[in-house]
């Protein structure tokens, strides 16, 4: 694994996904999370962990959470890994 450059904990708002049609809400929430992390961590590549994806999809495609708390770890090669904050 590459050297860790930065590690932050964010509460990411996913409320804008609720404006999407019912059958597109969870995918829209994943995109919103990816865009938020790219913007705030200045990342070239964002890898979303399985645990985060499962948390977003937990209640199905129609009802993603309004916000999610995640831990973002940036490595020296510019990639960011996103996991659930505990």
Curated annotation (Swiss-Prot):
GO terms for biological process: cytoplasmic translation. Keywords: Ribonucleoprotein, Ribosomal protein. This is Large ribosomal subunit protein eL31. PANTHER family: 60S RIBOSOMAL PROTEIN L31. HAMAP family: Ribosomal_eL31 (MF_00410). SUPFAM superfamilies: Ribosomal protein L31e (SSF54575). Belongs to the eukaryotic ribosomal protein eL31 family. The gene is rpl31e. The lineage of its organism: Archaea, Methanobacteriati, Methanobacteriota, Methanomada group, Methanopyri. Pfam families: Ribosomal_L31e (PF01198). One of its GO terms (molecular function) is structural constituent of ribosome. One of its GO terms (cellular component) is cytosolic large ribosomal subunit. The keyword Ribosomal protein applies. It comes from Methanopyrus kandleri (strain AV19 / DSM 6324 / JCM 9639 / NBRC 100938). The keyword Ubl conjugation does not apply.
